[in-house]
Amino acid sequence: MRAQGRGRLPRRLLLLLALWVQAARPMGYFELQLSALRNVNGELLSGACCDGDGRTTRAGGCGHDECDTYVRVCLKEYQAKVTPTGPCSYGHGATPVLGGNSFYLPPAGAAGDRARARARAGGDQDPGLVVIPFQFAWPRSFTLIVEAWDWDNDTTPNEELLIERVSHAGMINPEDRWKSLHFSGHVAHLELQIRVRCDENYYSATCNKFCRPRNDFFGHYTCDQYGNKACMDGWMGKECKEAVCKQGCNLLHGGCTVPGECRCSYGWQGRFCDECVPYPGCVHGSCVEPWQCNCETNWGGLLCDKDLNYCGSHHPCTNGGTCINAEPDQYRCTCPDGYSGRNCEKAEHACTSNPCANGGSCHEVPSGFECHCPSGWSGPTCALDIDECASNPCAAGGTCVDQVDGFECICPEQWVGATCQLDANECEGKPCLNAFSCKNLIGGYYCDCIPGWKGINCHINVNDCRGQCQHGGTCKDLVNGYQCVCPRGFGGRHCELERDECASSPCHSGGLCEDLADGFHCHCPQGFSGPLCEVDVDLCEPSPCRNGARCYNLEGDYYCACPDDFGGKNCSVPREPCPGGACRVIDGCGSDAGPGMPGTAASGVCGPHGRCVSQPGGNFSCICDSGFTGTYCHENIDDCLGQPCRNGGTCIDEVDAFRCFCPSGWEGELCDTNPNDCLPDPCHSRGRCYDLVNDFYCACDDGWKGKTCHSREFQCDAYTCSNGGTCYDSGDTFRCACPPGWKGSTCAVAKNSSCLPNPCVNGGTCVGSGASFSCICRDGWEGRTCTHNTNDCNPLPCYNGGICVDGVNWFRCECAPGFAGPDCRINIDECQSSPCAYGATCVDEINGYRCSCPPGRAGPRCQEVIGFGRSCWSRGTPFPHGSSWVEDCNSCRCLDGRRDCSKVWCGWKPCLLAGQPEALSAQCPLGQRCLEKAPGQCLRPPCEAWGECGAEEPPSTPCLPRSGHLDNNCARLTLHFNRDHVPQGTTVGAICSGIRSLPATRAVARDRLLVLLCDRASSGASAVEVAVSFSPARDLPDSSLIQGAAHAIVAAITQRGNSSLLLAVTEVKVETVVTGGSSTGLLVPVLCGAFSVLWLACVVLCVWWTRKRRKERERSRLPREESANNQWAPLNPIRNPIERPGGHKDVLYQCKNFTPPPRRADEALPGPAGHAAVREDEEDEDLGRGEEDSLEAEKFLSHKFTKDPGRSPGRPAHWASGPKVDNRAVRSINEARYAGKE
């Protein structure tokens, strides 16, 4: 391990070194290429000769020992007045010894680069090149000091060895081209070239824009020639990390990681993630929020899978049978005479009427009858004669007429030809009557009938009377409907209700019917009157609607159809785009935040130099920082408008400031200072020096001649005139003829002609330096001559398909329809203007809206009145047609003024005993009060604070808990609880109320009153017994109804639901009666005896096998950890069903939804482990008891469901200590015990 750690250390050091090298990479380079140096006299700046031989030029010139010349370069910040002292803040460099007094090097450019490449290939270094790297934003302005020195084997600078010092303060932009500089000093003439280049992946005029192309998690972009990130297709954002989602994708419920997709959040779906996911398994329902299941019409149940109108959806009854909806997914057929079966599919005595003609014989079959025809006849009743028309030669439904040796086709109107094979356009004759349109078909035509009509020509009124009316009611056919005229004493849509005075709901408009001895009395709601509340008080007389709106009188209310310019209940409020100022204002300075972001996100509309201020109506204005102006604060105020720089200086505009770049010969902040070129004295005491602009003049003494009084013979030499000027000797003086672009006595002053005409466009400023120039571009422009407009639309700032319009240092988003905001991130809420009529709900959509209409209204804006269903009243509260509500433990719904409620006896409601008197009375229904519960009703203490609402007795029934009574109208449920999971303070009454409130309990109590009574079970302290019965109990031929109710309640309990009480249930036992006929005879006893013999044989075989295996293990004497242990657990067996007339049977089921209850670690486990250590005599005794139990079986049907919330399926069992034995002969302790055992 230590060696491995020592191996890791070098790797870590190498990694840190690599990271340091990467971080230390420069942003750019300043390069200087020396081309030539000419020191004609071989002298130093002090006038002495090189190599310190003591001679001076004043004494007559230097000897043949030339200077050993090398160059030092110092780069520092821009100085209006250059000072040679001080640090080289930008960097410094030096060359080796390059030559003697004068030398030439390959110039910069293509030819020079090739020469230097050949030198490097030969192993030589480029001697005249000085490269100074920098790791900061290049400021473009700089000061360059170049010094030529004489090498004298001394590493310390010595001013006495200085040959020449020249300086240049100017501006240069990064580019590949070289910029030439010429210097004529006091002693030497220097020619050099400079340039600035950005390092790889660095761009802009300051080399501080870093851009490295990438296509990974951190970005998806390339780099253009200006270093701008160009997002790849489908990506956007500052770093091109945000994928462009599908247009219209709801960013509140979805997003994307791949361009063009729209990935929905959990619970949402659809193309734009704007559709919620319904509850799993929801069949005929929809949702508004995720995991809902709102049922469609005629569907019910938790998953909307219960067909409430099975007859109307499936039409199961055949042969004219009448279908009646019994309960969800159930129906009953009332068959006509001569038919029977569940669907009236069986015909009875079909051959009695001799249906077979021409001597055919009739045979009855389950579906009716069949005719066996004699030779020469065919058909269902042997009525068809076989002839030439038997092959159906006539097409298109033509009628074949048999003739002698032939046939004739009588074609329908739609067809013509010998065999009716040619089609005719039947729609020309307009055959369709009550139809939307006529469509010509091949071989006929089709009439698109209006609802309520049928037939080929839509001329037959659909007979909607199909036996729906019961109890002798007369059905009256209507167009697309029917009406039942009921006989006296019956009512309802199908005359299915037995009428009393109030059963037919005689009171209209939601009136409450009061049954009286001699009739009834209607208590009308507000807005109605009359004996039957049939008189609707016309609230439209006089009309309350304003501004010309039409008034509609509704049920107890009115509705005003407002014009487009007004709204409100009475159309008295002018409609505004933002009524009451409650509309959401589109903030021009912000955008909607995306998921996980704060409320608003800055849009950046004012750029980096302004602050956005919102204005009314979604507008904005920008408050600019000092030095900026413009609508978007995108324009830098030009501080050079007053031309503050003097003497031809170039003014460079900066942020709220300016800078002057002076021409040669001038310095200072405003270029108003002429530096003294006579310092140090260039005349070397041979004459008097006069200062000029970027030059000097020596008035020589004692016969000395030349520019610096250095010659006795000539005024001119090769270096008298600078920059290529031609020298003319005039005897006592000289004259220089300057080339274009230069002026002055020695051609040392540049005319700045490189900026004439101005090469910089779009407001750029040209800074000349001899024959070269540099452009300083205004914000928003870039390039060598400021020709490229900076792309402010990159990276893409516009969302949802918005188009970005690039300006000069600004951008604008043109949004797609339905979107707004500076970056098109706001989905325009078309509901802000309240386009929907009063009372309707507006739902915003992309580039539109949708109106959700209240009942009785329709139209695009819910402005059309189509009528209302009647409301229902419950306890003084009105409920509109189609609505649902809960009363106590029952669920109710309103069906056109009729209350349809489940019939569950809600029993005694739990209540708190302690508290204020008014609070105690409010817990119980009217007329009841909170009383102390009966003793022994607490399932898990403390329960002293809980009581029960009294004064309501249950219906009289013999089906009581702990009574042992079972019949066709009585079932008994025994619920076993895990007391550790039962909440404290739980009483038997609370459990009973929870079961009564189950949706499944309400569903089985539609036709009869369902009574549930609870008490502590005698089988254990953690068990509750529930007695289930219907009231009244008459007309129950068998126990199927009570069995169905019991099993539905048990199924709901096993699903647990959201009740903490039901989660604590570990086992449910169901007991119902099973009736049998006397026709069984001796079959049951014989079967019981045979089963008993087989069971005893199995027991004997198991005992023998167990002993044999035990002996084998004792002989083998294997170690304990190597012995096999069979972990197979026996299933709960079905006990011997003993069936006899009027008796009962006891059957045991294992509930797969439940798991066995948890047990203590020291408690013996059921199954093999729990019986491993049982002695052999104890096993025999248990077997004997099992036989006795089977003979003492009672007559109750018992279904047992068990579960264990405390053990997970994957947890290993804890086996008890002792020798390991075969487990297959051991009975599970979960085997059923017969109820009622003595």
Swiss-Prot record:
Tissues where the protein occurs: Expressed in heart, placenta and skeletal muscle and to a lesser extent in pancreas. Very low expression in brain, lung, liver and kidney.
Every EGF-like domain range: 241-274, 275-305, 307-345, 347-383, 385-421, 423-459, 461-496, 498-534, 536-572, 574-634, 636-672, 674-710, 712-748, 751-787, 789-825, 827-863
Topology within the bilayer: Single-pass type I membrane protein
GO cellular component: plasma membrane
Alphabetical list of Pfam families matching this protein: DSL, EGF, EGF_CA, EGF_DL_JAG, hEGF, JAG1, MNNL
Molecular function as annotated in GO: calcium ion binding; growth factor activity; Notch binding
Sugar-bearing residue positions: 153, 570, 619, 752, 1058
Function of the protein: Putative Notch ligand involved in the mediation of Notch signaling. Involved in limb development.
Transmembrane domains' residue ranges: 1081-1101
Gene: JAG2
Organism lineage: Eukaryota, Metazoa, Chordata, Craniata, Vertebrata
Disease as annotated in the protein's UniProt record: Muscular dystrophy, limb-girdle, autosomal recessive 27: An autosomal recessive muscular disorder characterized by progressive muscle weakness most prominent in the proximal lower limb and axial muscles, and resulting in walking difficulty or loss of ambulation. Additional more variable features include neck muscle weakness, scoliosis, and joint contractures. Some affected individuals manifest impaired intellectual development or speech delay, cardiomyopathy, and cardiac arrhythmia. Muscle biopsy shows non-specific dystrophic changes.
Protein name in the entry: Protein jagged-2
